[in-house]
UniProtKB/Swiss-Prot annotation:
Family, per entry: Belongs to the universal ribosomal protein uS3 family.
InterPro entries attached to this UniProt entry: KH_dom, KH_dom-like_a/b, KH_dom_type_2, KH_sf_prok-type, Ribosomal_S3_C_sf, Ribosomal_uS3_bac-typ, Ribosomal_uS3_C, Ribosomal_uS3_CS
Subunit structure: Part of the 30S ribosomal subunit. Forms a tight complex with proteins S10 and S14.
Source organism per UniProt: Leuconostoc mesenteroides subsp. mesenteroides (strain ATCC 8293 / DSM 20343 / BCRC 11652 / CCM 1803 / JCM 6124 / NCDO 523 / NBRC 100496 / NCIMB 8023 / NCTC 12954 / NRRL B-1118 / 37Y)
SUPFAM superfamilies xrefs: Prokaryotic type KH domain (KH-domain type II), Ribosomal protein S3 C-terminal domain
Gene Ontology CC entries for this record: cytosolic small ribosomal subunit
SMART domains reported in the protein's UniProt record: KH (SM00322)
Protein name as it appears in the record: Small ribosomal subunit protein uS3
Key words of the record: Ribonucleoprotein, Ribosomal protein, RNA-binding, rRNA-binding
Location of the KH type-2 domain: 39-115
NCBIfam families, A to Z: rpsC_bact (TIGR01009)
Pfam families: KH_2, Ribosomal_S3_C
Gene Ontology biological process terms from the UniProt entry: translation
Length: 223
């Protein structure tokens, strides 16, 4: 089961939390879901060069939306004197639905810096995709990503690239593994990502698994 299922969804509720934290009535659910999709799509498109890894959206009231952006380049997102993040907040507010008085929802943005981007599966996959689009040999791109992740402290990493590799006529799959990646162990902190590289010979799929160690339950102090 652990070999087939998405490792992120497999661990939600065990060692990983939801990326969207809100509850809505049946009448409001679809509207809020589409709001989330618009917000995520806008951030991913306009902050494509800011190494954004994860976007969390939380709603405490119907008129407030809290957006947490995890990025390896917080300075690029915040801008000089907070100018860029203020522009982003204004644009995200315009993407939300208005109330009866025509007012948009209040949007609050929290920027979280990623200390070790080489331990993020999405950022590693994006790096490999960028190398492949620049015509770097796929084996060199994969081995370079594995070496950087290992130096950053990864317990294990697996990278899989599929498609017309190096312009071959027949598509195939190549994969490299370093260390251990225990997919069946629920306490194992495994970050997973699927990314895509658009090359002259077609699109290449990139799957990345990074094992960052075990997440053990906190022991309660006995009185």
């Amino acid at each position: 089961m652990g070999q087939k299922i998405n490792p992120t969804g497999f661990r939600v509720g065990v060692i990983r939390d939801w990326d969207a934290k809100w509850f809505a009535d049946k009448a409001d659910y679809a509207n809020q879901l589409h709001e989330d999709l618009r917000i995520r799509k806008y951030i991913e498109k306009n902050l494509a060069d800011a190494s954004v890894d994860r976007i969390e959206i939380e709603r405490t009231t119907k008129s407030r939306v809290d957006v947490s952006i995890q990025t390896a380049k917080p300075g690029m997102v915040i801008g000089k004197g907070g100018s860029e993040v203020e522009k982003l907040r204004t644009q995200l507010a315009k993407l939300t639905d208005t109330d009866e008085k025509g007012r948009s929802k209040r949007v609050f943005i929290n920027i979280v810096e990623i200390k070790k981007p080489d331990l993020s599966a999405h950022l590693v996959g994006q790096q490999i995709a960028g190398d492949l689009e620049r015509r770097v040999a796929f084996r060199r791109a994969m081995r370079g990503a594995i070496q950087r992740a290992t130096r950053s402290g990864a317990k294990g990493i697996k990278v899989m690239v599929s498609g017309r590799l190096n312009g071959a006529d027949i598509a195939r799959i190549e994969q490299y593994t370093e260390g251990t990646v225990p997919l069946h162990t629920l306490r194992a902190d495994i970050d997973y990502s699927w990314d895509e590289a658009m090359t002259a010979y077609g699109n290449l799929g990139i799957k990345t698994w990074i094992y960052r160690g075990d997440v053990l339950p906190q022991k309660k102090n006995s009185k």
